[in-house]
């Protein structure tokens, strides 16, 4: 264990030094670009820059922007009347709500219409999750503090190993 910590420290030290050198190279190139920009500004008067900006604003096609916005609004209004879109929106809202409710709570607490934990909820084993879900731990057993285990949708290679309730 001590060897692993020493190795981790050496790797961290190496990464800090490597990124430090990279940062100084980036800072030097950014400083050069800034110096060139300041030289350019020094050569050009502010009045001519303002005149150029005003001319660009006058040339801009505001009518095209407004017509595109109007078309986008009409498409959104048409989509909002579509039944499939409404179903997808409802599903998305429910999924976001389930993911947002990913805090720990007592097993058996109602989540929606179920008496089990929602997808994305922190879990300790498969028995915390609904029968059609499983408890997934991305970090395995070696680092549970860094990545929490959550209830996930059961896929073909994963199964809920909790014994059925009697």
From Swiss-Prot:
- Domain Oxytoxin-type inhibitor cystine knot (ICK): where? 113-166
Q: In which tissues is it expressed?
A: Expressed by the venom gland.
InterPro entries recorded for this chain? Answer: OXYTX_ICK (IPR044061)
Protein's UniProt keywords contain Cell cycle = no
Mention any one GO cellular component term assigned to this protein in its UniProt record. extracellular region
One GO biological process term: defense response to bacterium
Coiled-coil blocks = none
Which Cys pairs does UniProt list as disulfide-bonded? 116-130, 123-135, 127-162, 129-151, 137-149
> Where is the segment annotated Linear cationic cytotoxin domain?
59-99
Top-level taxon of the source organism: Eukaryota
The residues forming the signal peptide are: 1-18
UniProt-annotated location(s) = Secreted
* Alphabetic keyword roster: Antibiotic, Antimicrobial, Cytolysis, Disulfide bond, Knottin, Secreted, Signal, Toxin
GO MF term set: toxin activity
Q: Identify the propeptide residues.
A: 19-58
Family to which this protein belongs: Belongs to the spiderine family. Cationic/spiderine subfamily.
Q: What does this protein do?
A: Has antimicrobial, insecticidal, cytolytic and cytotoxic activity.
Its domain description in UniProt is: The presence of a 'disulfide through disulfide knot' structurally defines this protein as a knottin. The N-terminal part of the mature protein (59-100) probably forms an alpha-helix which acts as a membrane-active peptide. It is necessary and sufficient for the toxin's antimicrobial, insecticidal, cytolytic and cytotoxic activity.
Q: What is this protein called?
A: Spiderine-1b
Organism field: Oxyopes takobius (Lynx spider)
Q: Source organism lineage? A: Eukaryota, Metazoa, Ecdysozoa, Arthropoda, Chelicerata
